[in-house]
Amino acid sequence: MRTDSKTPLLDTIATPTDLRRLKESDLAQLADELRTETIDAVSVTGGHLGAGLGVVELTVALHYVFDTPHDRLIWDVGHQAYPHKILTGRRDRIRTLRRAGGLSGFTKRSESVYDPFGTAHSSTSISAGLGMAAATTLSGGNNNVIAVIGDGSMSAGMAYEAMNNAGAMHSRLIIILNDNEMSIAPPAGALSAYLARLVSGGTYRTVREAAKQLGRHLPHFIYDRARKTEEFARNFWAGGTMFEELGIYYVGPIDGHNLDHLLPVLKNVRDFKETGPILVHVVTQKGKGYAPAAAASDKYHSVNTFDVVTGVQTKPKANAPSYTRVFADALVKEAERDDKIVAITAAMPGGTGLDVFGKAFPERTFDVGIAEQHAVTFAAGLATEGYRPFCALYSTFLQRGYDQVVHDVAIQNLPVRFAIDRAGLVGADGATHAGSFDVSYLGILPNMVIMAAADEAELVHMVATAAAYDEGPIAFRYPRGEGVGIELPQIGEILDIGRGRIVREGTTVALLSLGTRLAEASKAAEQLASYGISVTVADARFAKPLDLDLVRRLAKNHEVLITIEEGSVGGFGSFVMQALAEEGLLDGTGLKFRSMVLPDTFLDHDKPEKLYAQAGLDAKGIVAKVLATLGRENEAHQSLIA
């Protein structure tokens, strides 16, 4: 063991098997060292810090008590999984988190056998764990299944659906409720820890079950009164009535940072073989053990690289405001003139910019929790009463409320405004957070209008257009990160629905862009001029309805028409192809049509600009596509390697 190391005990741990060889008295030191290593690693890579620091002791205890990976351990969302990764054979790569070719910022099945289920979106762990538990029963296995879920994730309906099913199935599933917001119970003390150890023990549960069997032979009113007395006494001290009503045996709350409390309870839960789900309620603190993160958990939930000593984060100087901030400021200006404008977010006020709107109009701002289905239908309800709701969600999270978009909004043609943030590729969070599919899945819906901002000034216009549009649902999408630095209008212009614009006139090739690929299309046009190719560049603005006049003009007046978008197959390019086919513009006209979309694969984490280059959606890729389409393959190849 190295004597000069800051983490001498952790240095001896390659896998949880090594951890389980330690004495219990060593675990507190191991937890301290694991916390130190987590802080140091995230200071280098950036990422989700506070949640991981809050579960260090819990992570150590779970891997010590349970036989992972034979016992399945699922981390809901995965923000808190960095300490888990360090203990499960990935410490040597922990400083590659969220970088190209490095570790994912979430749990990932292809990364480790210790990650039995991939996560990133919230509230999935209980459902997945219940499926694993049912499979264990069917196959006659004996492994435990443990799902760790935070109290924030418990606001999603999926978690309650899973718990309701778990209680009815009587499958053996262990749920760890990580309460790090004090939203369910106050801090746990010695008495509650003692009671948790008592009621989780085999003796108590065996006697309780025997009493139930005996009670069934007593007169009903006596049995019922005894049952209620026992439940009242236990829940008075420990809480958990709601879980018991769902058929889940509740234990807790206990201090999630006290190993002397955690270990005996987890051992009792592990060793008692009665079927049925168990929930262990642990109370933790986000950012535990690192003063800057503990003092400002919201600011240290997700961080840039930072100085470990001071906690000061490294933030590159912005060259332009972010699209998110431009949206927020534009919405505030619209709301100053229209008191019917309201805003809805699903537990992401800061991420969507609605914290800015909330400061200006707190009574008109609704944070509904991690509940996208509810958010969409809640917005629909507001729309029925004459309000103008803006439902601001990340593209990837809007997927979670898709049936509500179809059934509650589109079919009823209600004027809900969808502000779709993080459209396109997002970078370090990878495939789970990419906004690749919204144009495809919204564009097939009757009544839906879809816009995509080419730059931040266009976004201001689209906010104004959405605010003024009362004929039905309307969506506008925009990416993560900074704008291009264009001057912003003071007041947004209301755009003509379904009308695009020409930004550069040419004669041979037409590039029809949707969204922020417009800048790359314009660069490509400049480069293609050196090849003697005259290029028209157009901004579609609308994916639906299409500007058919513009499409006809581009198709009839050019040899080549190429659509470019930051989305998957089945989106804007497919809509244009359908229109061309219906108009007969592909019938022996000689037009060469191509569609540039994201590849039919899930792209891993990297910087967005590198991912777009990988997908061929940068200026170099567009130049190569044009040259190849014109039959100049050698030049196309040379342009890519230049």
From Swiss-Prot:
Keywords: Isoprene biosynthesis, Magnesium, Metal-binding, Thiamine biosynthesis, Thiamine pyrophosphate, Transferase. It comes from the Bacteria. This is 1-deoxy-D-xylulose-5-phosphate synthase. It comes from Beijerinckia indica subsp. indica (strain ATCC 9039 / DSM 1715 / NCIMB 8712). Belongs to the transketolase family. DXPS subfamily. Homodimer. PROSITE patterns: TRANSKETOLASE_1 (PS00801), TRANSKETOLASE_2 (PS00802). It holds the Pfam family Transket_pyr. Mg(2+) binds at residues 151, 180.
